[in-house]
Amino acid sequence: MAVYNYDVVVLGSGPAGEGAAMNAAKAGRKVAMVDSRRQVGGNCTHLGTIPSKALRHSVRQIMQFNTNPMFRAIGEPRWFSFPDVLKSAEKVISKQVASRTGYYARNRVDVFFGTGSFADEQTVEVVCANGVVEKLVAKHIIIATGSRPYRPADIDFSHPRIYDSDTILSLGHTPRKLIVYGAGVIGCEYASIFSGLGVLVELVDNRGQLLSFLDSEISQALSYHFSNNNITVRHNEEYDRVEGVDNGVILHLKSGKKIKADALLWCNGRTGNTDKLGMENIGVKVNSRGQIEVDENYRTCVPNIYGAGDVIGWPSLASAAHDQGRSAAGSIVDNGSWRFVNDVPTGIYTIPEISSIGKNEQELTQAKVPYEVGKAFFKGMARAQIAGEPQGMLKILFHRETLEVLGVHCFGYQASEIVHIGQAIMSQPGELNTLKYFVNTTFNYPTMAEAYRVAAYDGLNRLF
């Protein structure tokens, strides 16, 4: 058994692990990365964010071709199978792996491919694919192993028609009808993707409102859009059992209803990847979902062991995970890069997409904050008309008296890009965070960004 000594060992090469390893390496520390795959990138690159967004992009292109009358001069609407569309994602994955492999090589981070587990508080044993065991001894260890779909024990995921958000990428056919159980972010995104391929979707939600953490007007807009695009949303429903049959799946609900479809996609929660880490050897406890608890410095109850990314729970976003990993390493190397990551924009890649940052109307009303609303509807925006993307809106919430921007909510074309302008203004100190910025700034025309000017004027016109 070979023994290697490091300043920092990072478990997991997803966004959190990458952020941690790069920050520690650039601070001059000797760093090792351990990943259970034979390629870097983590679930984000191989099973989550990258393939699903590449898949979504291809589906949007198909939808544009099939719905734009101009293309009828070229030919009739085309039908594409799910496996055909998935090929585009495979190309992106290989490019991402190559880029990230280069990052580690340039920064002299040693990468070990194998299953890593704690022998003690300063030692990680890595069992490589060929059976060889490597021992890594480190002053500090960062757990960034990510998460996987939560699988209830009473559902047979070995059935060929029952999938989770990882295995759905191996779907070898295009179902005529699909049940998506769980209407969280992942469930809504996949419902949009399959709807765009012409699949009838039954989206089962155990709550009374889609994505209830969003501003209610944005949530309602998404629900309305779904109802117009082959997606039936069933609220306040819980599964009783899932029955796999020869030609499909039957979902039995506790309400007594039954739904039959060609396949079922389970999207109801995620579990931290901690079960194989040997946590009992270091005294770090995990909750019922396999997640570890950390303090504001991303330190666990063991002083030299840290956690970042999906394995610690909220907000379970790739963007936040990278910053959490970077901040965890910042706590170790003390190079001024630490910050507690809490000002995270939400990006939801439905079709159309959704993004938001800051407070929503419900929260401001409950807190008795005197706010006003400014709106810009995309159907009136020149750039949206040119792009053939009239659905959606930008909504700015601001303080009636100080004009401080309190929240930005967007639904529609390029929403995940548009939100960052509002984010930048909201991060400014004192009087620099003001709605007046948007009316005193010249925006390129035509752009989606000028929706801020339109929304700001709309909001100011509501004041008296």
Swiss-Prot record:
InterPro entries: Class-I_Pyr_Nuc-Dis_Oxidored, FAD/NAD-bd_sf, FAD/NAD-binding_dom, FAD/NAD-linked_Rdtase_dimer_sf, Pyr_nuc-diS_OxRdtase, Pyr_nucl-diS_OxRdtase_dimer, STH_gammaproteobact. One of its GO terms (molecular function) is flavin adenine dinucleotide binding. Its cofactor is FAD. Keywords: Cytoplasm, FAD, Flavoprotein, NAD, NADP, Oxidoreductase. Its main location: cytoplasm. GO terms for cellular component: cytosol. Disulfide bonds: none annotated. It is found in: Cytoplasm. Its EC number is 1.6.1.1. Signal peptide: none annotated. Binds 1 FAD per subunit. It catalyses: NAD(+) + NADPH = NADH + NADP(+). GO terms for biological process: 2-oxoglutarate metabolic process; NADP metabolic process. FAD binds at D35, S36, R37, R38, Q39, V40, G41, G42, N43, C44. Conversion of NADPH, generated by peripheral catabolic pathways, to NADH, which can enter the respiratory chain for energy generation. Belongs to the class-I pyridine nucleotide-disulfide oxidoreductase family. This is Soluble pyridine nucleotide transhydrogenase. It comes from Pseudomonas fluorescens (strain ATCC BAA-477 / NRRL B-23932 / Pf-5).
